[in-house]
Amino acid sequence: MVIDLFRCIGCHACTYACKAENTTGKGVFWTLVFDYERGKYPNVIRSFLPILCMHCEKAPCEQVCPSGATYKRVDGIIAIDQNKCISCKACMVACPYHVRFQNPEGSRAAAEAHQKQERSISRQPGIVEKCNFCKDRIEWGIAHGLTPGVEWDANPACVNACPVNARTFGNLDDPDSEISRLISTQKGEVLHEEFGTSPSVFYISVGRPLPSRIRMR
């Protein structure tokens, strides 16, 4: 995913779309938009920074999970098998971006993710949750011949909801994809490269230094 910080207006449409799509519990946010200030008075500028799971190539959360609940899929998405999660919260401690939440109540809801598909979302109490790039939408789209990052029904909900098209989704392994083009031509950069986790979420912020530290929780 690529997020263009020049386009983001801090409207939180992505946050609301995520909660509606994934029926996350109270106080559980798989994506959030932070606002921060740059510069010094009187030349101060307010900026916005959307945060979500970075789906790292070298994910610390996967490395520390004792039960194998956290795993990396073939497509690079870091996912959680709730049937294996033992609620130890080791992954929450290990994640340097602090984008994992433990849902104490669990949830059960029927969500209409697509016009042609209804699915039941059920989560057990105490299970750790996070952004999964709306993998159910991606899988449904691919199964119906759609291309993630191109067709609406195969995109994460946050991408579709953004009114200014600040988010772009696609295949990082395809050099001809729109997301690869943006990273190359717009100098996409990752948040906290010094962590050495090789995130799959890039930001376009040429000339705008990313904040040194922001926590979701």
Describe each PLM feature range.
Residues 1-217:
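Non-ligating segments of multi-cofactor redox enzymes
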